[in-house]
């Protein structure tokens, strides 16, 4: 197996580790790292939670014999940071530990990094290889990449439908929906919720189903709830307004909305063709990277 093939093997392990941070690190990206000495992994780590140490720090700190680091290769799925944020620059730690070779899956498009991590390492005389499993590394963080590059949230549309294309029957308010999804798919949906930053429904879904839009069948956080309600038709006693969790209501600029609890924020945007661009811009401003649309 040549060096490039070996690099791919260890980068795949970085991706496995990085995925363990799913649902816990946003708005940061998921990142995994391994430290390799003479073909053997002697340390590994991943970014576990937003605000906590990055993957490179955890991987380096997990090495029992720090004296081996000047003989090691560090693999990391995303370019090491080069700026001060909630944690110090990972690039500086790598230089300090005298690690001679670093293999990077993909560059970080975040403006404060954007290639500067690689520059910092190379200026210190470190061999840097980039682009190993690059597409896989980008795909893992597609929500982060979309937000940084396109300056909008990544949007996931979710629905359940019958084989012949129906999603529900015609029903009066208060009538239960016909259940199409099963228990397994319901758990999967709640996993999606735990991984999303926000979840959105329209007026009809909010009125007909009175959903909670919380994460209950999977571990993790509940997303920010967003209700599109142009004409204030959603009852003020709905679950999304009364359970004390944070919700946003998007309504028209001239709509008079009833007084709601402090946990509910009312945002006024122009509806029509400008609604989606305006909504995505508002969510980007709030650092929402992944929007799940459920109805």
State each model region's role.
Residues 27-30, 154-155:
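Short, small/polar residue-rich loop motifs at catalytic or cofactor-binding pockets
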Residues 31-39, 158-160:
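Short beta-strand scaffold segments in enzyme catalytic cores
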Residues 100, 289, 294:
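Short acidic/polar active-site loop segments enriched in Thr and Asp
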Residues 31-32, 203-204, 294-295:
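Glycine-rich beta-strand-to-loop/alpha-helix junction loops that act as flexible
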